[in-house]
Amino acid sequence: MLSLVFSAMTGLVGAATLAATLSLLVLLTAAASARRRPAPISAPTLLLAVVVPAHNEEAVLVSTLKSLNAQSYPAECVEIVVVADNCTDSTAAIARRLGATVLERTHASERGKGYALNHAVSHLLIQPVVADGFVIIDADTVAAPDFLQQISARISQNTDPRGYGAWQGRYGVLNAHDGWRAALMTTAFDLVNHVKPLGRDTLGLSAGLKGNGMAFTRALAEVLPWPGGSLTEDLDYGLELARRFDLRVQYVPEARVQAQMPATAEQAASQRSRWERGRYRLVRERALPLLGEGLRRRSFLLLDAAWDLLMPPLAEIATLLLLFLGLTLLGTATYLLPHPVFWLSAAGSGLLGLSVYVFGGLRVAGAGPEAYAALARAPFYALWKFALLFTDWKRTPKSADEATADEWVRTERIPQADAAPTTEIRHL
């Protein structure tokens, strides 16, 4: 009986982690085979509204707006709109000084990025001249000089008969050299924000929205308002695109943005805590209903979205694979597992597959030596992350109302010197 229970437990852990690893390898294979799309030569020039949600961002907003003002795109075709949401600093004044349209918003309870974006897009949709596309850039972000050109070209190539379209640019790290945490985030972003969406896009699936460097057509903005009270408003919006319109998010790796990441333990804990609380709440509330709806509608797009929600993050997959290996070794030593060669082979294959994904993915992403070097810190990061999750477990919001209260509890920023990300994208 004990052997049966132990085998079932080991098999459950192994099946889940091996399925996740196989999924990552499929995406890596697709990403590695993706063809580089040549930059458009004579794409139509569209009117774009660039929305920058900001809450007390005076330390970093100058670099963001300078990068947007320096775009290789006709200035008369771009309106930069900064939403100064519940600000108590000079964010609004800085934005006006640098030529942006400023929408100042104050609300006692509806606070956060989602509400700010909803306010801005609603305002822009009722203007006499409405933009062809809406672009969302975070206030701590530097956009590559050709970012808007690449986004505009993709919008102009949209073939959806309804005019609906959503795109995600390549979202990377601006301060990769500010300590090992930022360096490791660079490595993670190469895998999560480039390899996975590139693979999904190549397979005809939704690349997903990452919250920064996103773009939407006017037609889509008119029928689907941006969600307000959510810590994961970008993920929620992407899921609604699939549910309501059978629409996938397309990936534009040539359109690059880079944002500041935490460099200290305190900053990292604040950001990671918010991200993980939002993600787990989203999984709890939406994954199984989405899976059921996908089965009822026979929609592979919805089934893939549900699977993506259920699949653990990379650190958790690695930890579970090590747990699988540990259970296998224990079961082999105590004779609780039959056919030990099978179990050991499965555990070894999982770890090998994950290693192939990580190192192969970094090669596809064109990562530099610092990205590989940062992997040496990954075990310490995983331990820190699980300790943080355990600490936060009892504080996880049980409802959207609870989550809303800390949406603008943002990470402290480090003032950045003027910078711009490289536009070069290296491929295999």
Where are these regions (language model features)?
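Cell-envelope/extracellular polymer assembly enzymes that use nucleotide-activated donors
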Residues: 46-49, 79, 236
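A conserved acidic beta->alpha catalytic loop
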Residues: 84-92, 107-109, 142
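Acidic helix N-cap motif at the loop->helix transition within catalytic regions
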Residues: 62, 89-96, 104, 146
